[in-house]
Amino acid sequence: MHIKDTLSRPLKDLRISVLDRCNLRCTYCMPEESLHGRGIFLRPQYLLSDGEIEFLVRVFVRLGVQKVRLTGGEPLLRPGFVELVDRISAIKGITDLALTTNAVLLPRHARALKKAGLGRITVSLDSLDETVFRKMAGERGTVREVLDGIEAAEQAGFSKLKINTVVQRNINDHTVMDLVGHFRNSGHTVRLIEFMDVGNVNQWDRKLVVPSADLLKVIHDRWELRPVAKQAVGETARRY
């Protein structure tokens, strides 16, 4: 038996939010004025336990899931997270176990995560410009901390990271080229993400959206872009 979506496409990916806390306050995700931004989070007893998460993963693997993404909040804030990764990675049938993180805590955990069986890491980084980064992160964290986290991941053996960048007009769009250039020959993949409407929590404004076509043109004007074939059925990202 395989689980499918409403278009009858097989669902191979499972995304699990292991907690709602975060050490940053990104304006498009957890702005300071939101409940989470003000420090109002779920009590620990209301979060899925390690055993419950492991049980759910096993159930979904039996239904055809092969890839598991661990997200938050910031997953590395969860006590015992490395041990949770170890338990999930031991489940037969999982071909890809990934983490999405802001990378600030990676220097402490990267080697242990690699040893525990984590396969990939996606890092959220919206700008290399310190002022822009701090503005978008709610005046928390630094670019240096994120880059140190990326370096720690590389040294631990994570050779191909994904760098997620949410692009907003007149906020960080003017810094995109520097970020793309920084990672261009690194072996990592930069993913430019349009500012998405997720309700009124992140104060979404259409005027802040930079269409992907505009970004492609700016990048292509400096470096030739060639489309890359999709890697899986139903994939929505366009690769170059």
Protein language model features and the residues they cover:
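Short glycine-enriched, charge-decorated loop/helix-capping segments at active-site entrances
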Residues: 39-47, 134-141, 204-207
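A C-terminal junction/extension of Radical SAM enzymes
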Residues: 172-176, 185, 189-240
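Conserved alpha-helical substructure of the radical SAM core
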Residues: 1-72, 76-95
